[in-house]
Every structure is written in structure tokens, then in C-alpha cells.
Amino acid sequence: MMLHLQGVLSKQQVAQCREVLDAAQWIDGNVTSGEQSAQAKRNQQLPEGSAAARAVGDAIQDALGRNPRFFSAALPLKVFPPLFNRYAGGDGFATHVDNAIRQLRGTDFRIRSDLSATLFLAEPDTYEGGELCIEDTYGVHRARLPAGDMVLYPASSLHHVSPVTRGVRVASFFWIQSMVRDDGERATLFQLDNDVQRLAAEKGSNDATVVSLTGIYHNLLRRWADA
């Protein structure tokens, strides 16, 4: 399931983040690459753990914590501290799949990457190219979103970033370990949660059907989740 989350950051928050990022020192993006990705990747990245990465990453994690749609879709157990990349002058990232396990450098913190996320930090009219292209059984889905919007998708997906031919594409990317590791089970819970919320808005939270479906949701979550 690929999901577009609108307005994870406000335009003001994006501007504040960009002020920090644009003043930071960037390095070769292959510092976080596995062997396969290193052969496919051409971009720049903020050093993990740098002051700029921590400051903007904290702002993103705070915003995610206030976003009920993100929680419903991801059911997050752990979130890898956000990383940041920059594409310009023909930079791109050929087709690859993300590593299954991500470990924070110099620490014991590691996660299973169930979901990948890209939060766009440049408006699409400021650059050309740079589409995030995600493959699944239904074809290729392309994301080139307004600044502050985020795309969430299974980390098992083949994906690539098309070359940026004009301007600069800046984004944050990170991974989520979900309480529910199976993509199909997680998608079922997300759909059920949306249906319950919609029915509750129509009939009230005390309606018998709403109460029953809420119970089914939590019992499925209890069956499938690792917390």
C-alpha cells in the first residue's frame, strides 16, 4: 500500500527546516548505502547525527506524533531518525530495494524496515525530474509531492529516483518498524480503522455497529501486533 500524507509539515515548518538544511554541510550520499545501493546512488546527504539532521529530524518526528493518519497507516513501533538527501545536476538513484535491517551508526539502536517514508522539502516547481517511482504488482506509482507532504510505502518495494535535471530536490527519508509487520494485515487494519471513523462520524461513537467494528479492529490488532 502506497499512501500520500498531506501537510505533515506546514509551509512555515518547511521553511524553518530548509533554513537549517541549506546552511548545513552535505556529504556523499553513499555513506548509508548497502553494496547494491552504492552502485546505483548519486546524491548528497547530511551526516547522520549532525546537529542539523538532529534538529530537523526532531521536528519531523514531533509532527508525525501528532498525525493520526500516519499512526493508523504505519502502526509504528520504532522510527529510524530521519535522514536527509539532496539531488541536483543529474543526480538520481537507480532501482533498488531498501535494506531489511537498519542500524543507527555508533549505537545499538536498530529496526526492521517494514515501511519507507519520503517527506518532500522542496516545491515541485523548483526542480525538474526527481520523481520517486515505486513498483508493486499493479505497476509503477510516481510521487513528486508538494513540500511538507510525505509518501509512505512498503520497504520491500523496488523503487528509484529519476535524475534531477534542473534545480535541487531536498527530502527527508526514513524507515518505520511497525507493530504489524505484514503489509496485508496492516492495510486491512488501516481500511477498517478508516471505515470505523467514517461510520462513527455518521452515526455517533456509541452506535452498536461502530462499537462492534471497533472491537473487531482491536481484536485483530491484538492478534497481529507485536508491541
UniProtKB/Swiss-Prot annotation:
Residues where Fe cation binds: 96, 98, 159
Cofactor remark: Binds 1 Fe(2+) ion per subunit.
Domain of life: Bacteria
Protein name as it appears in the record: PKHD-type hydroxylase Bxeno_B2194
Keywords in alphabetical order: Dioxygenase, Iron, Metal-binding, Oxidoreductase, Vitamin C
Cofactor(s) recorded in Swiss-Prot or TrEMBL: Fe(2+); L-ascorbate
Keyword Protein biosynthesis found: no
HAMAP family associated with the record: Hydroxyl_YbiX
Record organism: Paraburkholderia xenovorans (strain LB400)
GO biological process, one term: DNA damage response
Xref: InterPro entries: Oxoglu/Fe-dep_dioxygenase_dom, PKHD_C, PKHD_hydroxylase, Pro_4_hyd_alph, Pro_4_hyd_alph_FE2OG_OXY
PROSITE patterns: FE2OG_OXY
Coiled-coil region: none
Domain Fe2OG dioxygenase: 78-178
Keyword Metal-binding recorded: yes
Positions of 2-oxoglutarate binding: 169
GO molecular function, one term: L-ascorbic acid binding
EC number(s) from the headed UniProt entry: 1.14.11.-
